[in-house]
Curated annotation (Swiss-Prot):
It catalyses: Random hydrolysis of (1->4)-beta-D-mannosidic linkages in mannans, galactomannans and glucomannans. One of its GO terms (molecular function) is mannan endo-1,4-beta-mannosidase activity. Its EC number is 3.2.1.78. It comes from Aspergillus flavus (strain ATCC 200026 / FGSC A1120 / IAM 13836 / NRRL 3357 / JCM 12722 / SRRC 167). This is Probable mannan endo-1,4-beta-mannosidase A. Endo-1,4-mannanase, a crucial enzyme for depolymerization of seed galactomannans and wood galactoglucomannans. The keyword Membrane does not apply. The gene is manA. GO terms for cellular component: extracellular region.
Length: 386
């Protein structure tokens, strides 16, 4: 999801400002914290077209929270995970990146400083130690995390943060040796902290990687080599791409998302042996399609995943209004489509110590009518199916 700052609620901004106003902690010179110890459970695996979580095979639901790793109040983090656990949601996708080109002076959280051709991982209390706590709380509450390593969009730095530090263009990121070396060093730094944690659902290459106008071989080669690298560091966890599902002949109506103009070939990329499952997103209003069109998008990807012999995760979907009326049919379609083994709505909202969590326009909040419709009732349907 590409965030729209103008849609953040005032309360959400206040919450973020309160978090960033806390005193700055130590910087990248601090030694890494030890990986949070694993609680009883098991590593997530796949079985045919299904996911297996803690020994249970079936369909699982979850959500996205780009902001949780940037919170400085541990109680807020624990509150979110306790509500996820209570509601029956099992997976949370979080930003594992927060790239900056200049070190913040206000004490705000950042993970990775990219400047003047160099890259420094922030392992301090205002850096990856915040992600440490997210992983630790997820372990305690039995929630599984998808952690990604970079953003295609400029929110929280993204690929353009690398471009500003090393030169070139966003398209160059996938093939530039210097940018890829910095990216891989960051991947290694993150994975080394959590490789033994059963809270990790999967490592994800990026949020919505695109290469507009590129041959599909550019993304393919990058996905293949990067996923191989991740597996060389950690063979215990699943690996996925984090793509939107663009570039697909199966079920195609010729509309923009099915085309290959963003440099992605969904089926070809999914066939890479070191990619364990498929990911796809759904935002009709951003793609020039209709809400009803989304049901075909879901079934098309289910068919492609079935053909590949791997499960699919309906990883992001959202609208800015009428959440229940619009998103419920998508959930039902996903739940009843072979090879779709889970869905994560965009995005989770809760009441934190400083006010409501950020609202990018697609958020709905814990305890609301929309939450009952799209979480409580959805979990009941999943439990009935499983």
């Amino acid at each position: 999801m590409k965030l729209n700052p103008s849609l953040l609620t005032a309360a959400g901004l206040v919450s973020a400002q309160l978090a960033s106003a806390l005193p700055q902690a130590s910087s990248s010179t601090v030694s890494p914290s030890p990986s949070p110890s694993a609680t009883p459970g098991s590593f997530v695996t796949t079985s045919g077209l299904n996911f297996v979580i803690d020994g249970k095979t079936g369909y699982f639901a979850g959500s996205n929270s780009y902001w949780i790793g940037f919170q400085k109040n541990n109680d807020d983090v624990d509150l979110v995970f306790s509500h996820l656990q209570e509601s029956g949601l099992k997976i949370l996708r979080v930003w594992g990146f927060n790239d900056v080109n200049q070190k913040p002076t206000d004490g705000s959280v950042y993970y990775h400083l990219l400047a003047d051709g160099t890259a420094t991982v922030n392992e301090g209390e205002d850096g990856l130690q915040r992600l440490d706590y997210v992983v630790s709380s997820a372990e305690k509450h039995g929630i599984k995390l998808i952690i990604n390593f970079v953003n295609f969009w400029d929110d929280y730095g993204g690929i353009n943060a690398y471009v500003k530090a090393f030169g070139g263009s966003k398209e160059d990121f996938y093939t530039n040796d210097a940018m890829q070396a910095a990216y891989r060093a960051y991947i290694k730094a993150v994975i080394s902290r959590y490789s033994d944690s059963t809270a990790i659902f999967a490592w994800e290459l990026a949020n919505e990687p695109r290469c507009q106008g590129c041959e599909t071989t550019v993304l393919y080669n990058w996905i293949e080599s990067t996923s191989q690298y991740i597996k060389s560091l950690d063979s215990k966890h699943l690996v996925c791409i984090g793509d939107e599902g663009f570039g697909l002949d199966t079920g195609s109506d010729g509309s923009y998302p099915y085309q290959y103009s963003e440099g992605s070939d969904f089926a070809k990329n999914l066939a890479i042996p070191t990619i364990d499952f498929g990911t796809f997103h759904l935002y009709p209003s951003s793609w020039g399609t209709t809400n009803d069109w989304g049901n075909g998008w879901v079934t098309s990807h289910g068919a492609a995943c079935k053909e590949a012999g791997k499960p699919c995760l309906f990883e992001e979907y959202g609208v800015t209004s009428d959440h229940c009326a619009v998103e419920k049919p998508w959930q039902n379609t996903a739940l009843n489509t072979t090879a779709i083994s889970g869905d994560l709505y965009w995005q989770y909202g809760d009441q934190l110590s400083g006010g409501p969590s950020p609202d990018d326009g697609n958020t709905f909040y814990y305890g609301t009518d929309d939450f009952k419709c799209l979480v409580t009732d959805h979990i009941a349907a999943i439990n009935s199916r499983n």
